[in-house]
Amino acid sequence: MVTINQLVGNARSIRVVKSSVPALESCPQKRGVCIRVYTTTPKKPNSALRKVCRVRLTNGLEVTCYIGGEGHNLQEHASILIRGGRVKDLPGVRYHVVRGALDCSGVKDRKNGRSKYGTKKLKS
C-alpha cells in the first residue's frame, strides 16, 4: 500500500493502453493501394495457403492484410479498404480487407453471412 507522502512525491502513473491496430490511427477503416498480392502458410499446427496482400495506406504506412472468403480479384495497384482484426495463425497480419468495397469484389455465390463478405441478396 502506498502512503500519502509517497503519492505527494510522485503521483500514480496512468496506464497507457496500446492499440492492436496502430496503422488505422483511431479510424474504423483506412484506404490503401495493394503493393503485392501473395499466399503464405500459417503457423503450426494449421496447414493452408492463406491469401494476403501488402498495402500502402493513405497515411504512408505499409501493412499486411488478410483477404477473407473464397476467391478474390485483387491485383497490384488495386485500391482497397482495410479494417482491423488479426489472423491468429498468420504472424504479423493484423488487418483484414473489406470485401465489396472499392476495387475488391464481394464473394461470389455466398448465401450465409453475406454482410461480412460484401455479397448482395440473391434474386429468387
Swiss-Prot record:
Source organism's superkingdom?
Answer: Bacteria
Q: GO MF annotations for this entry?
A: rRNA binding; structural constituent of ribosome; tRNA binding
Q: CDD domains given for it? A: Ribosomal_S12 (cd03368)
Q: Where are the transmembrane segments?
A: none
Location of 3-methylthioaspartic acid modifications: 89
Give the record's keywords alphabetically.
Methylation, Ribonucleoprotein, Ribosomal protein, RNA-binding, rRNA-binding, tRNA-binding
Biological process, per Gene Ontology:
translation
Q: Mind telling me which InterPro entries this protein's record contains? A: NA-bd_OB-fold, Ribosomal_uS12, Ribosomal_uS12_bac
Any one Gene Ontology cellular component term annotated for this protein: small ribosomal subunit
Q: Does the keyword tRNA-binding apply?
A: yes
What Pfam families does this protein's entry cite?
A: Ribosom_S12_S23 (PF00164)
Question: What is this protein for, i.e. what is its function?
Answer: With S4 and S5 plays an important role in translational accuracy. Interacts with and stabilizes bases of the 16S rRNA that are involved in tRNA selection in the A site and with the mRNA backbone. Located at the interface of the 30S and 50S subunits, it traverses the body of the 30S subunit contacting proteins on the other side and probably holding the rRNA structure together. The combined cluster of proteins S8, S12 and S17 appears to hold together the shoulder and platform of the 30S subunit.
Whom does it interact with, and what assembly results?
A: Part of the 30S ribosomal subunit. Contacts proteins S8 and S17. May interact with IF1 in the 30S initiation complex.
Q: Which family does it belong to?
A: Belongs to the universal ribosomal protein uS12 family.
- UniProt-recorded name of the protein: Small ribosomal subunit protein uS12
